[in-house]
Curated annotation (Swiss-Prot):
Gene designation per UniProt: mutS
Protein name, entry field: DNA mismatch repair protein MutS
Keywords: ATP-binding, DNA damage, DNA repair, DNA-binding, Nucleotide-binding
One of the record's GO molecular function terms: ATP-dependent DNA damage sensor activity
Database matches in InterPro entries: DNA_mismatch_repair_MutS, DNA_mismatch_repair_MutS-lik_N, DNA_mismatch_repair_MutS/MSH, DNA_mismatch_repair_MutS_C, DNA_mismatch_repair_MutS_clamp, DNA_mismatch_repair_MutS_core, DNA_mismatch_repair_MutS_N, DNA_mismatch_repair_MutS_sf
Ligand binding (ATP): G658, P659, N660, M661, G662, G663, K664, S665
GO cellular component, one term: cytosol
HAMAP family, per the entry: MutS
Family from the record: Belongs to the DNA mismatch repair MutS family.
Organism for this UniProt entry: Brucella anthropi (strain ATCC 49188 / DSM 6882 / CCUG 24695 / JCM 21032 / LMG 3331 / NBRC 15819 / NCTC 12168 / Alc 37) (Ochrobactrum anthropi)
Transmembrane parts of this sequence: none
Function in brief: This protein is involved in the repair of mismatches in DNA. It is possible that it carries out the mismatch recognition step. This protein has a weak ATPase activity.
One GO term of the biological process aspect: mismatch repair
Xref: Pfam families: MutS_I (PF01624), MutS_II (PF05188), MutS_III (PF05192), MutS_IV (PF05190), MutS_V (PF00488)
């Protein structure tokens, strides 16, 4: 597209002296008008082959994108800042802006410049915003991570009772879900889905009760008018979007759920403007169907990302062997929302077991899956007008792979989940598949405007236009040969120039043959007489010239019509295409978990309705793989049995003591991760595992402060511990590490002691509790379901060897000084720490300042280093003098003991 020359205004106009009033050009007036309607977005304003930004937008975008900031014209006596990005590279720049939290309004030219000129020489090309690009409404391949969903979430709330619900949509795949929530669960439910954007009513956005949750989410939270969330008008909005007369086939939704659905759909309509992404019907999630994992637990267990935000090092990365984008997204969904129904879990485990038993079929199917493109995302791009020929090609390749996979499994006796998936794959639209094969070329361009994507022979007119476009010389030469034969003039030529176009040229001597008869005169039309030649044309040649001139445009027009035809057909089959793509993702996840189990030596867990938790030879899935990559010592497997000690009883609590670096935190985490893997339907890193379904998982492992909210490490620890003690029930699994370490020793011990008693008596849940407060091991005599276990170590020549083995019993020390030495603390600090430890253990916690400075121990180290070194050899040494002055026969027992300590001190100062 091109802009009219007058849009920028004349140089003279835009560089008028500052003293004179400067009138904005028509183009800039149009820009300001459009920008006024999109104040919360950067405006990408189409100018020919560029998107340009002006004023504050230009300043912000140039800084965010690292592009040159220039100027164009003046406004109110000031230069107008301007920057721009090429249209062909716009996706790359959009990606950077969205990642930095910006919203972008894309403003396109909506008419041809020639049309604008018809309205007058100074008319401006019409422009309009065709789309708002926001973090939650992305569809372009470059803007999306193939392994992650891109959810837009809306929160609905009803007036009066304030009931809450969440609806979340991935418009790139059509996924649409809804669930009720509560203020207590809101943060956890939002973080489980992990949306890229959260849309809320402006009234809720400023609600003092909910605002802290929005701050914690840390995502793009977008307030919208409350009218968009009106549950009373929601049914009409849903019916209009899905083009149905009634919602009877959608199931029953509560008022807050309708409010959330309405808000989500309204926001999609607002951002997509004229386009309507095809969505699945909203699927209702029922409370309790998935394992509740609060945000702190999700973060500390590093399920999808590590604490530093990286995918590498997470559980998801460790277990991911998928080969398709859809499979990777389904695996992530299952891992972050494990099931709580043993029957449903068993169905998934049956699928993994089947692929383990049919390894040749598993390998053959995975080989086919590797070629499967992301069909749902390609379909969505086609539906909203952002697709290209390769998106149609992705459907064709996906159909082909689906057909092969269905054939591979046609006669197999499959478990239920895989059988349903095979049925969905087999139901692919065969007629449309054949249509795509006939229509699409083998090599497809990225953009439809490039043409060349329709296979030769599909459309006869297109073939003719291509022949004219690509073979015009051959066609002209053929026509010239016909004319030579007809006239007998061997020297006849068909030539071309910019004035006459194509013409027939003969020498003056041969011109008579072209004009001798009335028939010849009517056939060969005189165009021009030259000194030695005459030029003619024919109706046939004129038509051919017109066809050649228009052939390229006509060929592209035909191809675009074919593209629209195929796109419409694809959208009409959206449900069956998505069902097949979902089935392929199920195959991918099940097969990949089988590959993982075989590769890592995992076992099938037994998951039931009991309160058992018996893990034999369990391992940490992430740490074990890291050790293998480093060719280090193999991971040490450990048992964990929190099962009830009697029929009908509650689960047990293990109180874990042991040294720093002994592996306590790893042991705690691995058991939580094994529970998650089992309930997501995966084999687990253990010799055997029997797990009674866990309904809520709580983990308090690791320490960090919350500076943004003014909370210390200890305060964060107490808040998270309070949440656990207030919410855990008998079917919960609780993992607690070092509760009470962030405060004074006796305060911390008291809190930890009381917390264990509460878990045992009130929550009555299965729990692992690690501590350095060895006094707590006495609780095993008081609490019948509590057992002491410890991490084994071996001491050797003042060093400690960590065996990383869990054994029954209690530790009597933590080996902190040895660990400090291993960490590289200065030797003086280590020695002083050892002395202080000995004195504390001996009960000598009071004395002179240079003997033990409780509050400032490092200053004591400095004092120790600065003292002059005592002489210990020779007759004049301090130690020799002290010994020589002793009168053994005159010493009382008490004086002798005091003297021994004095001599030891002198020796130590040496």
């Amino acid at each position: 597209m091109e802009t009219t020359a007058n849009e920028h205004g004349s140089e003279a106009e835009e560089n008028t002296a500052e003293a004179a009033p400067v009138r904005l050009t028509p183009m800039m007036e149009q820009y300001i008008e459009i920008k006024a309607a999109n104040v919360d977005s950067l405006l990408f304003y189409r100018m020919g082959d560029f998107y340009e930004l002006f004023f504050d937008d230009a300043v912000e975008a140039s800084a965010a994108l690292g592009i040159t900031l220039t100027k164009r014209g003046k406004h109110l006596g000031e230069d107008i800042p301007m920057c721009g990005v090429p249209v062909h590279a716009a996706d790359d720049y959009l990606q950077k802006l969205i990642a930095k939290g910006y919203r972008v309004a894309v403003c396109e030219q909506v008419e041809d410049p020639a049309e604008a000129k018809k309205r007058g020489s100074k008319s401006v090309v019409k422009r309009d915003v065709i789309r708002l690009v926001t973090p939650g409404t992305l569809t372009e391949e470059k803007l999306l991570d193939p392994s992650e969903a891109n959810f837009l979430m809306a929160m609905g709330r009803t007036r009066g009772d304030g009931a809450l619900a969440l609806a979340w949509i991935d418009i790139s795949t059509g996924t649409f879900r809804v669930a009720e929530t509560t203020p207590d669960r809101l943060f956890a439910d939002v973080m489980r889905v992990d949306p890229r954007e959260l849309v809320v009513a402006d009234s809720a956005f400023h609600d003092e009760e909910l605002r802290p949750v929005f701050d914690l989410v840390g995502k793009a939270v977008t307030p919208q008018p409350a009218t968009l969330f009106d549950s009373a008008a929601a049914e009409t909005r849903i019916q209009r979007y899905f083009n149905v007369a009634t919602l009877d086939g959608f199931g029953q939704f509560s008022r807050p759920e309708l409010s959330a659905i309405s808000g989500a759909i309204a926001y999609i309509e607002k951002t997509q403007i004229s386009e309507r992404p095809p969505l699945m019907r909203p699927e209702r999630e029922h409370e309790g169907g998935t394992l509740f994992i609060d945000p702190a637990t999700r973060a500390s267990l590093e399920l999808a990302r590590t604490m530093s935000g990286n995918r590498d090092g997470s559980l998801l990365k460790a277990v991911d062997r998928t080969v398709t984008g859809g499979g990777a997204r389904l695996l992530a969904e299952r891992l972050t929302a494990p099931l709580t129904n043993p029957k449903e879990i068993a169905l998934r485990l049956d699928s993994v077991s089947w692929f383990l038993s049919e390894q040749s079929l598993c390998e053959a199917m995975r080989a086919e899956l590797k070629g499967v493109p992301d069909m749902p995302r390609g379909l969505s791009r086609l539906a909203v007008g952002r697709g290209g020929p390769r998106d149609l090609g992705s459907l064709a390749r996906g159909f082909e792979a689906a057909h092969v996979i269905a054939s591979l499994l046609e006669s197999a006796l499959l478990p239920d989940e895989l059988a349903h998936a095979r049925d969905a794959v087999s139901a692919m639209p065969a007629i449309f598949t054949a249509h795509l094969d006939r229509a699409l070329a083998d090599e497809l361009p990225l953009l439809k405007r490039d043409g060349g994507f329709v296979r030769g022979g599909y459309n006869s007119e297109l073939d003719e236009m291509r022949a004219l476009r690509d073979q015009s010389r051959r066609v002209i030469a053929g026509l010239q040969a016909n004319y030579i034969e007809e006239t007998g003039i061997k020297s006849l030529k068909i030539k071309h120039n910019n004035v006459l176009g194509y013409f027939i040229e003969v020498t003056a001597n041969n011109a008579g043959a072209m004009t001798d008869t009335d028939e010849a005169k009517s056939r060969f039309i005189h165009r021009q007489t030259m000194a030695n030649a005459m030029r003619f044309t024919t109706t046939e040649l004129a038509e051919l010239e017109s066809k050649i001139a228009n052939a390229a445009d006509r060929a592209l027009s035909i191809e675009l019509a074919v593209f629209e035809e195929l796109t419409a057909e694809a959208v009409s089959h959206a449900d069956s295409i998505r069902a097949a793509a979902s089935a392929l993702a199920v195959f991918d996840v099940s097969a990949s978990l089988a590959v993982l189990a075989e590769e890592q030596g995992y076992c099938r867990p037994q998951v039931d309705d009991s309160l058992s938790f018996n893990i034999v030879a369990g391992r940490h899935p992430v740490v074990e793989q890291a050790l293998r990559r480093q060719a280090a010592n193999p991971f040490v497997a450990n048992d964990c049995d929190l099962s009830p000690q009697a029929d009908g009883g509650n689960g047990a609590i293990w109180l874990l003591t042991g040294p720093n670096m002994g592996g306590k935190s790893t042991f705690l985490r691995q058991n939580a991760l094994i529970a998650i893997m089992a309930q997501m339907g995966s084999f687990v890193p253990a010799g055997s595992a029997k797990i009674g379904v866990v309904d809520r998982l709580f983990s308090r492992v690791g320490a960090s402060d919350d500076l943004a909210r003014g909370r210390s490490t200890f305060m964060v620890e107490m808040v998270e511990t309070a949440a656990i003690l207030n919410q855990a029930g008998e079917r919960s699994l609780v993992i607690l590490d070092e509760i009470g370490r962030g405060t004074a020793t006796f305060d911390g011990l008291s809190i930890a002691w009381a917390a264990v008693e509460y878990l045992h008596e009130k929550n009555r849940c299965r729990a692992l509790f690690a501590t350095h407060f060895h006094e707590m091991t006495a609780l095993s005599e008081k609490l019948e379901r509590l057992s002491n276990v410890t991490m084994r170590v071996k001491e050797w020549d003042n060093d400690v060897v960590f065996l990383h083995e869990v054994a029954k019993g209690a530790a009597d020390r933590s080996y902190g000084v040895q660990v400090a030495r291993l960490a590289g603390l200065p030797e003086a600090v280590v020695n002083r720490a050892r002395d202080v430890l000995h004195q504390l253990e001996a009960g000598e916690t009071s004395g002179k300042a240079d003997k033990l400075i409780d509050d400032l121990p490092l200053f004591s180290v400095v004092l120790q280093q600065e003292k002059p070194k005592l002489q210990v050899q020779g007759k004049d040494s301090d130690l020799t003098k002290a010994v020589s002055a002793i009168s053994p026969d005159e010493l009382t027992p008490r004086e002798a003991l005091d003297l021994i300590y004095k001599l030891k001190e002198l020796a130590g100062r040496a």
